[in-house]
Structure formats: C-alpha cells, structure tokens
From Swiss-Prot:
The lineage of its organism: Eukaryota, Metazoa, Ecdysozoa, Nematoda, Chromadorea. One of its GO terms (molecular function) is cell-cell adhesion mediator activity. This is Contactin rig-6. It comes from Caenorhabditis elegans. Residues 1178-1196 form a propeptide. PROSITE patterns: FN3, IG_LIKE. It is found in: Cell membrane; Perikaryon; Cell projection, Axon; Synapse. Residues 1-19 form the signal peptide.
Length: 1196
C-alpha cells in the first residue's frame, strides 16, 4: 500500500480575533465577490497609478485567473451598467490586461496600453481584509438611515369629513432614531411635541386630507446620538376632475370612410387613462371594443370604417381613481359624411397621432402601452417590431386585436424605436414611436462611513451615471442644508461643493456628523448618507488584539500583523529582540506592518517588537515566536475491522502549564470528522524533563470497518494550533459530474419553484475496468445572487434523485440560483462540477405572514391599522407586493369571530381594501353605540395571496367616550424633572384613547403640560422649577382636541437646586506605593448643600475618559461621608493602566442633580512629569476607587 505524507503550511494568526470580527464580511467600501472582497474604482487611472491606489488600500489589482471571482465581478459590472454606468473597460491584474464589455453585454479580457486611463478593480488579500475589519471597529455603528419609498408626489382627494393621508418614513439605526416631521421646512410633529392636526404612527405621518394641504411639501428626519438624516420631500397634490362642457357639436366621419371621436375631456389630476364611451343617449349602454372599434388610452374613439349602425349618439366618460368618482360628457351624434363608401374598400392609413405611447413620459419600472390604429377596409392586421432589429422584450404581450403592445416593467434596454405595420389586401401603412425612459437619479456608488484624523482632507462623492450628471444635487450635514455662503468664513474656506462631490479640508472634530447627498430630477430623488468621525487618538494595542505567543510549524510560512488602534494611522514597525528594524526584503521581512517569515527555521524563534506611533504618542507590543516540529501522522492497521491513526505534536515550554492545548482537528476527505459519527478519538498528553518542560500531545483516531473496507480509506488530515499534516491512503478519486444542465419544471401549466438538475459522469468512469470506486450518491450545492457563498442544499430542498438527475424544490420564489454537484460514497466526497448557469425561480405568492398587528381609533368611524412589513432586505417573492386588510363589524354581545369560524380560513372578511404601506385607514359604517371589528391582514402580490396572520379585535364607540386615566406613581428625579406613570380604566373596551395630557400648575399659576401617545404609560416631565410645588392631573384627549374626565389631582414637589459652584482640579499625579502605584486626584471643595440640610445624597462625581477624545466617560461617585478631609477633597484612583491617556473631570451633586463640571485635566500614566515622589506629611487616608473591573467592562 502506497502512502503520501504532505505538510500543510498552516500558521497561527490570532484565532481569537475571529470572535471579534466577522471575517466572512467585507470592510466598509468593499463588496463581496466569490470569497474575496473587491472595490470597483470608477475614477480613471493608468496601470501604474491603479496598482498604487490598490496597494495603498491594502490590496492589489484583481486576479482574473480565479474563475468564480471573475464571474462574480462581471455580474457586479453588469449591474452597474444596467444602472447607467457607461465605462466599458477596467484595469485588472496582469501587465496590460483589462476587462472589456462586448456588444452582447458580456465581458472579456483584452490587452491594452498600460498608460491608458481606465477605471480599475482592486481586491483585498486576507491579511489586509482582517486588519481593515479590525480597524473598522473604531467606527461608531448605528448612524440613522431612512429607507426611501421612491414617492416624490402623493395625490389625495380633499374631504370635509375625517380622512387621512399616510406619509411613509421607515428608519433604521442604533440607538433607535427618533422621527420628526416638517411641513414646508417647518417642524410640525416630533416625539417631544404634539399637534392634534397630525398623527405619528411609528415613523409614518398621518395628515388630514384637507384642501389646505394642497401643494404642501413634507419631509421627515431621523435622529440619534450619532447624527441626523432627512428624507427627500413629498409633495401633496389634490386629485380633482372638472365637469365636461354642457354641449358639443356633432361629428362627421372622415373622407377615408373611418371616424375619430375626441373625448374632449375636462381638466383633471392626476392624468387618467380610464375612459369609456356611452351610446344610444343612455348612461346604461357602454360601448364595447371590437376589431373595428378602438378606444385609445387618451379617450379617443376610433372606427376603422363607418357603417350605418354607427350613426348614433355618443358621450365620453372619464374616471379618476384617486377621487373615486367620474363624469361623463354631453351626448352628440356621429354622422356619416360618405355613405357611398360604406361598402368600399381602401388600404390602411394610420391616424396622424398613431402610433403613440402611454404614459407619455414613461419611467423605468412602469408598464407602458404602445398603440397603433389604422383606418382600413377590410380590417387590417398589425405587426410590431423594433427598428434596431432586437427582439420584442419577453415581458411584453399584444392585445386588442394586435393594436396594443404592452411591456411590463420597462428598463433601459427596452428604450428605442418601435415600428407598427398595418396591412390588408390593398396595401400597408407603417409608423414608428420612440420609447424614451426617465428615472430618478441613480447613485452608482453611495457614501460610506469614514474615520479620519484632524487636519486631514476628506472627500465624499455621490457617483452618478452619465445620464444623471445634470441632476440637481443637495448636500446636508445632520439634516441641515450645507450652503457655503451661509457658513462662517473660516469654515467656508475649508469646504467646497463641486456638484456631486463634497471636499472638506483640515477637518476638525466639529465636522463629525452624518453627511448626506440627495440627487433629484423631475422624476424623483435618490439619497445616500455616511457618518464622518473626526478623531485623534494615540496608538493603543487593544487587549486580545495580538497574541503574546505565536506557534509556527517548522518549514511553514508565518505572517504576523501589527494590529493597533490609532488616528491618524500609520503602519507599525517591527524589530527583532536586539532592537534592529526588520528589512523590507528577504526571508524575514516587514511588509508594511506585517512580519513575513518564509520556510520557518528553529533559529527564527524569539521575541519580536512592534512599535506604532503618531503625533499623539507611541505604543509597543511584543510577540514571542515559538517554532515547533510539524505534527506527524502514524497509521496502524490493527485488523481488517479497524484502522488506528495518531497525530502527535512535540514541543518544549519553560513551564508546561504555559503550553497551549494543541486543539487537534481531524478531517476526512476535507470534511470535519464530526460529520462521521462512527469515528472515535482520544487525546493523550505526556510530560518529561525538569518541571515538565518537554511536552507531547497526541490524538488517536479509530476508523471502523464501515470506513476502512478494502483499506481504501481516503485522505486524512490533522491540523492543530502548531500546523498540520495529512496522509493519503491509495484510492482512486471520485469523478466530478460533467455537462450539468438545469431544467425548470412545470406542473399543470404553472411554473413552480423547482428545477431538475441533469449531468453525466466522465467516460473513463463508466468503464468499470479501471476499478473506480462506486458512486453512491450526489451532493447538491447552491448559492444565490445575493448570497454568493456555496452551501449544501438543505434536505427539504432535495426531492427525487435518480442515477444522473435530481429534483431541487421548495426554493425561494423570484430568486436567482446557481448549482453544482459532487459525487459521494461512504467515505469520500468528490470535487464539484462546473457551476450551472444562473436560473431564476418563478415569482410566487408571499410566504411570510403578518406580525405585530395593532390598531388605533381615530374617531367613531375611523380605524388606523398597523403591522410589521415583510420581505425587508430580501428579494421580493413576486410583483406588486401589497397588503389586504379585511374586517367584519358586529355589535358588542354578538360573537364577531363567528364570521371567521364559518368561513374558509383562506377567505377574507366581507369588507377589505389593499394597501401598499404597512398601515391602512379604515372608514367604517355609521353605527350607534359600541361595536367591535375583527381585523385580518394578509400579504398579496400579482402571483397570489399569502396566509392570514393572527386576527385582532378592535373596539369603537359612536358616542365618543374617552377612557379614564388614573395616577399610578409619581417620583421626583431632580430639580427640574419628575417621573409620572398612570393606568387606563379597563371596565369598558369601547372607550377610546388617543393620548393623555399631563397638566401641572404651580402656586403662582404657571402651567406646564405635555401630551403623550396612548401606548405610553409613563413620562418624564421636564422644565419644572426647583423646590416648587405643583398641582397636577391627567386627562385623555382625542385627535380632535376633546378631553375625557380628569384624574384625581395630585401634588408633586421638585427637588432643590443642584450645586452652583464649579470644582477646580488641583493635583493629578501618579504615586509610588509599597508594592504598586496609584493615581492621586485632588480638587477644590464647593458648597454642595444649603445649611441645616441633611448631607445624604451629596458628594462629587468623577468622570474618567480613556483618551482625550473619548465621548463616553466612566462615572464614579464619591459621597461626602467617604471624604476624610471635606475642605481638601481627594481620591485614589486604583487600576489605571500605565501609558494610557486619561482625561478627568469633577462635578458636585446633591439630590437636585449635578452641578457645573470642572475643566478637564489629562495625564498619560508613567510619562515624565507624572510621578509624585513626595512622601507626604499627612497620615490622613485617601479614599480609593477601584477602577480595574469597571475599565475592563467598559472596554468590552
């Protein structure tokens, strides 16, 4: 039996970092492609500068030899092209190589002049990827964001009764952002203010459908501690339809024999495409279209030729959906001017308006209609084609006897000229219509978060397509417009806006915040935002960022990065144990902060030092490299039933307790041993030598007969903390399937979410004389466009399996998949096949159900219903997702849920409406007294209906009684704030509640009030005067300003004034103790409490900031009772770390709150001038504050 032992070059990089960062993700500003991270840089450069840029970012020009990487990058480029990117050529790795877009939309590698300027593509190596991910942890996360709806205009029908318009504002961030709304740039509603004219529903705003809001502009903002963003404005436009003219003249047929009746529609908004015609002087007789009669989408009625029966009276009818009304015009007569031509024949002649397109200015994503009508006798046939020779889009279909070509969801590829030909036996006529598409501006590459040091230059670019280069671009900082002319002169010099690029010079900390660009045109807006953090910090090596010891196997290659936090950031410098800097070339070298040692030798072991410094300071870290022999594998065939394999590591440590566990891991045919439950392993450890300095660690693996039959086991690999080794036991390789194809399966004529994969094995495997192992099955792997990582198909996805095919089912609808297949036998898995082409599942009905269904009564006939939206951040299951709200009404006392019990669960209640937002406003029938409404919501789309979630019962009362509210508890917090909580009366479900109003009046008559939404049961009331009594009550209030019964009055007393004086820090020094050191802080005493008052709750607060620029402090209390000398207060700060920079502030406090905070004092412990060598003459003990545990928790 032949065996091959192979050494695997495995080196220990800091494994614990894996727990700190997600190495499967890409750093900010990079995109995942296959298993790598890439950046597509649009700014053109020559080959030299492209390489320099990629190298500066920690990467290199993309390697085109990796097939999966190349395919994924091509997909990214195709997406950019579809969004408007016109650049066809990109520099990639290799001398003079580039990716070039071909006429068929694919990309191929070409050779170009290296001095030519083109965009380029960088990819990150693993070390740089890890380093950037770690450095990225310095960036604050959770800046607010607003998900755009794409709506720039909303039409509404003004009403006198209560009706509302829902304006969407979906926000994200951590901490959760607060939402405020503005009307014409004036704030109208936020969580801290109330306005009975508006309702805040989650982040969405409900405004009354009043004519006073016509042409008003609304926008929302989202704000948290990191910054603020704003949405593009939404313009409210009233829907209306004017009356038709009362009279119109009769119409005569055309000389050709046909007829054209214009609708002569009145002014209306929005423009309607819904027309019909009445005839016979009756509003009950509606004209039907046929091969001879055609109603255009602009309302025109055409006759191919006129017969005697067509001489009748006609009237045009127009309806506008958003007004839920329509009008019809006066009746008039059609008179044939050429009766002799009734039975004549003539060739087709297109009307002067034909062909035409609807809507007239189509947008990307619209469904468009191309119309073509010709006068002719006999009736003509119609034929559609594209002038450029391309096929008609697959999303199109022809209707209305060939006269209408409809194209669903048009994209830029559908633009161009279309030709219509009308033909009969006597001739033909042709015409062309040009499809020009519009769209909101497309931001090809958005802004991304940045961390920069002070005095650096920063640029943000909203990269627009060439077609959008003339769009309007506005810039905002924390939701405020950036207008250079309105800025102070100093800042105006530093800031420059060049259309879609913002330049900021010599940045300082006041420039930190959320920057946002909004690109707009007459179609809509697009927006992108990013958080800029301007911060200086001295280099710090975070705990657990670098291992104190690195173990490397003899003969392997090891790389050790210098990982630290700093701003500004430079590469760390490595030196050996003697202090000599490592060279940049050679077997042992420093590659911009990364030690690289090739073919590790035993004499390479020892200490290495990394030094990081910037203008604020310097920091050091040391790493000990320990070289060990690679693990060895021994194979012992015990009998025909069992094989025993052992993997052994031998190393020497100063103390065996310091030798880390080897952490062995076995793999069989590249799959973890834990996937083979029949395997058994056992770990041994043996010590020898003085004090156990010599250590052997061994793991045994027992392989049973089921895997060891015929001694053809496969490949066994043992890896450990110190390296790895593997053993091949002779065995023919399993063949990889070839010629993989994918067939979409149909059932009952409907496309299902299932595919049939077919393949074949290579010819040599089918010849059993080569003693190839028997293939016992196949493993299907898949990935999606959105998640490009290969993974095994779950069991529920794999259906019927045959010799050379398999069914994959239960896939997500409307999702693109790629598949590959591996051969499998009992102890081995073969290499994967070449991936299949991308295939897309058919759209389907929504599979998610609605959660968190809530309701609120707006009045006795109006309900606001809200729920959690579905399909957030994922592919939509089908077209036109919306929500169907259905309800059933009943008076209290009748079981309203009987309707649901008697009906099919898949049926809706008798009343229902569809909403494209996760809320709806229901107008109910007028009913006296109390009633309950059973509500149900299901998601639906054009492909079908989803399932109904849990029903909810709402209660309404036509008498408008408001619930009674009662005080639960009141607790003064400080001199100006008090916490109030309450409960609602539950004796009746029908009493309504919209909000609660808190009203407090002091003895001098000064009033403070606050209105709080009904879903809150507590509120912190602020703005109160110190040491003042207030009489308060609670009342329910509805959205019309009507109040319910007041609660029983209660009195509150605010606390005293906080201290008014500011402490002064006198001494901040490091002091040597007997066995250690401490930090002494002294400050001036202030008056904390008025005379003759208790000292309970009085003292000083010490604020400790780790670094000069930290924004969050550790707060420590020093109660007055703990001070040994109240006239000269001081404290010992134990647990501070050497060489760390700390900033200290002090403030006094009493039950009324915290007083003014002192000026800061900073200290770097251990630096010259920070030691206090005096012994001191006083024996008064100084109270100590232990910080070590608190600091560790703060760092975590």
């Amino acid at each position: 039996m032949m065996m091959l032992i192979r050494c695997i070059s495995i080196f220990l990089l800091f494994g614990f970092v894996n727990a700190l960062i997600d190495e499967a993700s890409c750093p900010i500003g990079w995109q995942i492609a296959s298993d790598q991270c890439v950046r597509i840089v649009i700014a053109p450069a020559n080959l030299k500068h492209s390489k320099k840029y990629c190298h500066h970012e920690g990467g290199e020009l993309m390697d085109t030899s990796v097939t999966l990487l190349l395919e994924d990058v091509m997909d990214l480029l195709k997406n950019l092209h579809e969004n408007g990117l016109s650049e066809p050529t990109f520099h990639v790795g290799g001398m003079g190589q580039a990716l070039n877009r071909t006429e068929d939309g694919n990309y191929k590698i070409i050779t170009i002049n290296p001095s030519s300027h083109f965009p380029f593509i960088c990819s990150l190596n693993k070390m740089a990827r890890r380093s950037l991910l770690f450095q990225q942890k310095l960036l604050p996360v959770g800046a607010p964001q607003i998900s755009l709806t794409g709506q720039s205009e909303i039409y509404f029908h003004p009403r006198h009764d209560a009706d509302y318009i829902a304006l969407p504002c979906t926000v994200q961030g951590n901490p959760k952002p607060t939402v405020a709304w503005y009307k014409n740039d004036v704030e109208v509603l936020s969580p801290s203010m109330s306005n009975v004219s508006y309702l805040l529903s989650g982040g969405n705003l409900l405004v009354p459908a009043s004519s006073t809001l016509a042409y008003s502009s609304f926008h929302c903002t989202a704000r948290n501690s990191l910054g603020e963003v704003r949405s593009p404005p939404i313009l409210l436009k009233p829907s209306f339809i004017d009356p038709f003219r009362p009279h119109r003249l009769d119409v005569y047929s055309l000389a050709t024999g046909g007829a054209k009746l214009d609708c002569d529609a009145p002014a209306h908004q929005p423009k309607s495409l819904t027309y019909s015609w009445l005839y016979g002087s009756s509003t009950d007789r509606i004209l039907s279209q046929n091969e001879r009669k055609f109603i255009s989408l602009d309302g025109t009625l055409f006759f191919s030729y006129v017969t005697a029966e067509d001489e009748d009276s006609y009237a045009c009818s127009l309806s506008v959906y958003s007004t839920q009304s329509g009008h019809y015009g006066p009746f008039f007569r059609l008179i044939s001017s050429t009766p002799k031509l009734v039975n004549s024949t003539f060739p087709p002649k297109l009307d002067s308006t034909q062909p035409q397109i609807f809507p007239e200015d189509p947008k990307v994503g619209d469904s468009i209609y191309l119309e073509c009508f010709a006068y002719a006798s006999p009736l003509p046939q119609y034929k559609w084609s594209r002038v450029d020779g391309k096929p008609i889009p697959a999303r199109s279909h022809i209707s209305n006897y060939g006269r209408v070509l409809k194209i669903e969801k048009v994209n830029y590829g559908d633009a161009g000229k279309y030709k219509c030909v009308a033909m009969n036996a006597f001739g033909s006529a042709a015409g062309e219509v040009h499809v020009k598409l519009r769209a909101p501006p497309s931001i090809l590459q958005g802004l991304h978060d940045r961390l920069v040091p002070t005095e650096s230059n920063v640029s943000f670019e909203c990269l627009l397509s060439n077609a959008d280069s003339y769009s309007s671009v506005e810039w905002f900082k924390d939701a405020k417009p950036i207008v250079p002319l309105l800025l102070p002169a100093e800042k105006r010099k530093r800031l420059k806006i060049d259309h879609n690029v913002l330049h900021l010079k010599f940045a300082d900390e006041t420039d930190s915040g959320v920057y946002q660009c909004v690109a707009s045109n007459d179609v809509g807006s697009s927006s992108s935002s990013a958080l800029l953090t301007v911060k200086d910090s001295a280099p710090v090596f975070p705990p657990n960022a670098m291992s104190r010891k690195v173990f490397a196997a003899f003969g392997s290659t090891v790389s050790i990065p210098c990982i630290f936090e700093a701003s500004p950031r430079f590469h760390g410098k490595w030196a050996d144990a003697g202090g000599s800097k490592l060279p940049q070339k050679g077997r042992i070298r420093d590659e911009e902060g990364v030690i690289s040692i090739e073919k590790v030798l035993h004499e390479d072991a020892g200490l290495f030092f990394c030094t990081a410094h910037n203008k604020l300071g310097k920091a050091h870290a040391q790493v000990q490299l320990i070289v060990v022999n690679k693990p060895s594998i021994k194979t012992n065939f015990l009998d025909e039933e069992t094989v025993n394999m052992s993997c052994e590591v031998e190393l020497t440590c100063e103390n065996s307790a310091e030798c880390p566990e080897a952490l062995f891991e076995w793999k069989i045919n590249d799959r973890p041993a834990k996937e083979y439950p029949s395997l058994k392993s056992k770990v041994h450890e043996k010590k020898s030598g003085h004090k156990g300095r010599h250590l052997k660690q061994k793991v045994d693996l027992e392989v049973p007969k089921s895997l060891a039959g015929s001694r053809q086991i496969g490949r066994f690999a043992c890896s450990s903390l110190y390296g790895g080794s593997s053993e091949f036991v002779t065995k023919p390789q399993l063949p990889s399937p070839i010629a993989l194809t994918v067939e979409q399966m149909d059932e009952d004529g409907k496309k299902k979410k299932m595919f049939r994969l077919r393949w074949r094995l290579p010819p040599q495997h089918r010849d059993t004389r080569d003693h190839s192992p028997k293939v016992e099955g196949y493993l299907v792997e898949l990935r999606t466009r959105k998640n490009r990582k290969w993974r095994a198909a779950e069991r529920q996805l794999v259906g019927n399996m045959e010799k050379d095919s398999i069914t994959v089912e239960n896939l997500l609808p409307n999702t693109e998949y790629q598949f590959r297949v591996r051969s499998v036998e009992s102890a081995a898995i073969g290499e994967p096949s070449i991936p299949s082409d991308w295939v897309k599942t058919a759209p389907g009905a929504p599979s998610e159900t609605i959660d968190n269904l809530k309701w609120r009564s707006l009045d006795s006939q109006t309900l606001l219903v809200e729920w959690q939206p579905i399909e957030i951040g994922q592919e939509s299951s089908g077209d036109n997702l919306r929500y169907r709200v259905s309800w059933s009404e009943a008076t209290v006392g009748k079981n309203a849920t009987d309707d649901m019990k008697l009906s099919n669960q898949d049926d809706d209640f008798e009343n229902h409406l569809d909403s494209d937002q996760p809320q709806a406003i229901l107008k109910l029938n007028t009913t006296e007294g109390c009633r309950m409404v059973v509500l149900a919501v299901r998601p639906v789309n054009d492909q079908g209906n989803g399932s109904v979630g849990t029903d909810t019962i709402a209660f309404l009362n036509s008498h408008g009684e408001l619930k009674k509210v009662s005080l639960h508890n009141v607790k003064p917090i400080n001199a100006s704030h008090v916490n109030i909580s309450w409960t609602w009366d539950n004796t009746s479900d029908c009493d309504t509640k919209h909000a609660v109003q808190i009203t407090c009046i002091n003895l001098s008559g000064s009033e403070i009030s606050a209105t709080v939404a009904s879903d809150r049961i507590f509120w912190m009331l602020g703005g109160l005067e110190a040491e003042t009594a207030y009489d308060c009550d609670l009342k329910a209030i509805d959205n019309h300003g009507s109040f319910g019964p007041a609660s029983k009055k209660f009195r509150i007393h605010t606390k005293q004034h906080p201290p008014s004086e500011t402490p002064l820090i006198g001494k901040l020094m490091m002091k040597q103790m007997k066995d250690t050191y401490t930090t002494i802080l002294e400050w001036s005493s202030i008056e904390l409490q008025k005379p003759n008052r208790t000292e309970n709750g009085c003292g000083y607060k010490i604020f400790i900031y780790i670094s000069e620029t930290a924004t969050e402090a550790i707060e420590l209390d020093m109660p007055l009772q703990r001070l040994s000398d109240r006239r000269n207060p001081s404290a010992r700060l134990d647990g501070l770390k050497l060489m760390y920079m700390y900033t200290i502030k002090v403030a006094g406090y009493n039950p009324g709150g915290i007083g003014p905070i002192s000026e800061p004092r900073s200290i770097r412990l251990g630096s010259p001038g920070t030691m206090d060598y005096t012994t001191g003459s006083s024996d008064v003990p100084i109270p100590s504050l232990l910080l070590l545990l608190l600091l560790l928790l703060w760092r975590l």
